[in-house]
């Protein structure tokens, strides 16, 4: 009896010992696992000088083809694991989102330029959740539908500008600038050249340039401890932060004084807004107006595809003519009735991804995948360029084939990201892009531009460089499809003076 009681008393200690031994064994086993393979590295700099400044995502794809769907690239002292297949990205960034839903530490752009206030760069935690709740109130499905009255009005103005102007890149940018400034600040701006909008756009351009130079402090974090005299990026970044702060504060003050409804006023009613200070709230709301480039880049790719792939355009125009006819413009009520147009837009975003290099994620804890070790705190990036041209997922991936999305509705679209880090403004982007694309295809036929009888060729691989990547400027010909289409456009798009205040107040009434 005594022996049995002694043994029973020993059981809890034995269980703890076995658990500890198992944990140590598991950790040692995991530590013995290698990092994912990758190109040979040089001492100290790693692969820093093997990564080209132009189109680095193409180099990553070449490395994926050589080393596999998950590779390690070392920039200075920092390891980055790059994912090159849909399966790897879904397995880690979606299915294991709890471990990969954070962001790495962005020293230059995150800490210095944005003062730790940029939502998209924050690590997962309470602050990020507060930011996300505020932005979700602005851009969720329901609120985006409330904004359709504004998309409708501004898309008609866009058609008029293209009809009478000839250029399309600037009108596309004006369109998104007007929408986001009206919704956020209750301001009517004429477009990207408007002084109030230009200030934000110019500072974003500078930020993106600084971000592209951030490889030194990010690759060698120890340099962050240098005094300002030896780290000139710190002074530049501090000046940008001060410019940001003044600009966003001025816009917020003006928004609260403006008569019509705007989201700044709406945000102050949110409980989440009371959990951040005024400077932080200014940055959260200001980030909305910094997102004007992405939509215009998608529409630039859309026009390029229209010219280079006339057969695909004929298919979608036949669908539009069948559903809508020549007597009215397309509307949001038609969205569900235009599956080929929706497939066309999915293909536009796959064929030339505007975030080809993806956005960095970070691992919370040590992990194991495909027999490889992924250490805690590692930067993990989904290379959209590799994934969108993955032959195992997309047949003939370099071909522009919208019908692939009809044939297989389960094909993965990654344009807006992964997991909890999916773009909070995606519903606004989808709706505002859809209505413009539908109305452009209803209104115009598209062709190459000609100068002195010579066709102006378009290089579909000639894209801008940076965090976002859109087409380099090219010329195109827009021709009204028929006199009837012209008549409808004159009737529907002829009003030059929109009552933005009335539109915003109508949107605001839906929030009450």
UniProtKB/Swiss-Prot annotation:
Subcellular location: Membrane
GO molecular function: heme binding; iron ion binding; monooxygenase activity; oxidoreductase activity, acting on paired donors, with incorporation or reduction of molecular oxygen
Keyword Membrane: yes
Residues the record lists as binding heme: 423
CC annotations in GO: membrane
Listed Pfam families: p450 (PF00067)
Documented EC number(s): 1.-.-.-
Keywords: Heme, Iron, Membrane, Metal-binding, Monooxygenase, Oxidoreductase, Transmembrane, Transmembrane helix
Bilayer-crossing regions: 6-26
PROSITE patterns per the UniProt record, alphabetical: CYTOCHROME_P450 (PS00086), PROKAR_LIPOPROTEIN (PS51257)
InterPro entries from the UniProt entry: Cyt_P450, Cyt_P450_CS, Cyt_P450_E_grp-I, Cyt_P450_sf, Cytochrome_P450_fung
Principal location class: membrane
Cofactor: heme
Topology term for the membrane: Single-pass membrane protein
Function field: Cytochrome P450 monooxygenase; part of the gene cluster that mediates the biosynthesis of the alkaloid (-)-FR901483, a potent immunosuppressant that shows efficacy in animal models and a probable inhibitor of purine nucleotide biosynthesis by targeting phosphoribosylpyrophosphate amidotransferase (PPAT). The only unassigned enzyme in the cluster is the second cytochrome P450 monooxygenase FrzL. The biosynthesis of (-)-FR901483 starts with the condensation of two L-tyrosines to yield (S,S)-dityrosyl-piperazine.
Protein family according to the UniProt entry: Belongs to the cytochrome P450 family.
Protein name per Swiss-Prot or TrEMBL: Cytochrome P450 monooxygenase FrzL
Organism annotation: Cladobotryum sp
